[in-house]
């Protein structure tokens, strides 16, 4: 008790997905990709929030950014992608978005700020070839976020 449970189920196409059922039910922060969704992300988010009630849901939309749903505010909205440097490789983009969001959310408790920073972090990350490179520390991320409007 008292611990935040954050999980990324990656690609999912069914609310009753056997493999992900426990993850969906336990998550306070739930991430997924829009790649296999059978309905528009906003409709999917409404179903996820009604059935599983995570505090926060983020659906990665690739080059279109991300969709955020926040239970306490009854908010559902899209955040655009950021462009901070040329895209070299999108390998690790989703993991970068997830990890940066969790870091920001745990640090501030603000899912809106956390997602904006995570989008910038992920946009920076995809500007390198290797999945093991292209990371920013908090100071560098804060500085970069001042120059990027999301």
Where are these regions (language model features)?
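Conserved beta-alpha-beta core of the PfkB/ribokinase-like small-molecule kinase fold
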Residues: 1-47, 64-65
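Conserved phosphate-binding/catalytic region of the ribokinase-like
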Residues: 43-150
């Amino acid at each position: 008790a008292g611990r935040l449970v954050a999980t990324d189920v990656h690609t999912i196409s069914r609310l009753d997905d056997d493999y992900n059922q426990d993850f969906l039910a336990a998550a306070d922060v739930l991430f997924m990709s829009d790649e296999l969704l059978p309905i528009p992300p906003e409709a999917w988010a409404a179903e996820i929030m009604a059935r599983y009630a995570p505090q926060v849901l983020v659906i990665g939309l690739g080059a279109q950014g991300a969709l955020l749903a926040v239970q306490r505010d009854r908010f559902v909205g899209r955040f655009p992608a950021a462009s901070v440097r040329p895209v070299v490789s999108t390998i690790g983009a989703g993991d970068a978005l997830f990890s940066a969001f969790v870091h920001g959310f745990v640090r501030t408790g603000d899912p809106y700020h956390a997602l904006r920073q995570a989008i910038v972090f992920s946009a920076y990350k995809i500007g390198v070839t290797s999945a093991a490179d292209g990371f920013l520390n908090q100071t560098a991320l804060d500085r970069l976020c001042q120059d990027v409007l999301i």
